[in-house]
Amino acid sequence: SFVRDDGPLEPHSYYRLGSGSTINASIVGFDPSPKEHEDRITAAISTIQRSVLEKIVLARSVDIQFNPPVDPLAIAARLIDQSHNKDGFVVDLSPAGGRYQGRTLVGSSPEVLIKREGSTVSAYPLAGSAGRVEDRDVDCFIGQQLRTNAKDLDEHTFVVNHLVNVLEPLCSSLEVPNHPELTRTNEMWHLATPITGTLRDKNMSALELALNLHPTPAVCGTPLHAAEDLISSVETDRGFYSGAVGWCTSDGNGEYMVAIRCAEIAAGGASARAWAGGGIVASSSADKELAETTAKLRTIMRALGLQ
């Protein structure tokens, strides 16, 4: 079955007040370890500085156990409750077959890959990020610094250029601001660019648009194939993390989010794996990139009661 609400979403009271609200989680492993991830970032920076590769997104994961087993809807309810925009997703991965039988993807993504309403299309790419802090003045300062940080602006430009290169031939008009805006979740500051356009071919569906756009440099890198090759050589399987999750109606309307801030729950609910990644460019700093993934993981960790 498929249920879609335009939001804000409202979790069922069972998951807030009843036994479904109880989650007992513990971290049991990392892939790779934080130190190994930092070493990978250092190696990637060196590769970028001496090759055609300009940007790569490296991800790491955290393995989690639940006792007793968890209902994925309980995690989704917490994600929605804690989400800045009060939204989230739950996807049964069983149709993918194999090891995905009975597994569930849950998350709350702030990044719109593509949305289509009639002939109007829109996207909201995110790239360039900084973790938020509790002190309000310091938090605002971090956000303002992000707006002018050369490394983050470069990282963001790669993503925007990719979307423009794909969408421009498909649109009779395309509006792209000259500078990104600052947006936030409860855990992160992000650079974001709202892109809107009018389709030439009104029969092109949201799903077709998503397939044309994915993967963007926000989850892979640029040039695409060079980034894909390096990712496949150093990372274990990402599963459905960094993919696209959404919907498309029979008339082609729909919306796809980038599958970030998410976790894959095992069949039976006894364990899960959560991911976070960060964009690496020539001027990146390994320790700061590691800290960025830790900040991004807070979304799912807070939903699990682990932070």
Predicted region positions:
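Contiguous alpha-helical scaffold segments within structured protein domains
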Residues: 2-35, 39-42, 46, 60-67, ...
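A short glycine-rich, hydrophobically flanked beta-strand micro-motif that places a catalytic Asp/Glu
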Residues: 56, 88-92, 239-246
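Residue-level detector of short coil/turn "hinge" positions at structural boundaries
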Residues: 54-55, 174
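Ordered, soluble secondary-structure elements with a strong preference for glycine-centered loop motifs
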Residues: 34, 69, 284-287
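Conserved hydrophobic core element of enzyme catalytic domains
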Residues: 194-307
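An anion-binding catalytic pocket shared by soluble metabolic enzymes
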Residues: 60-154, 158, 169-175, 252-277
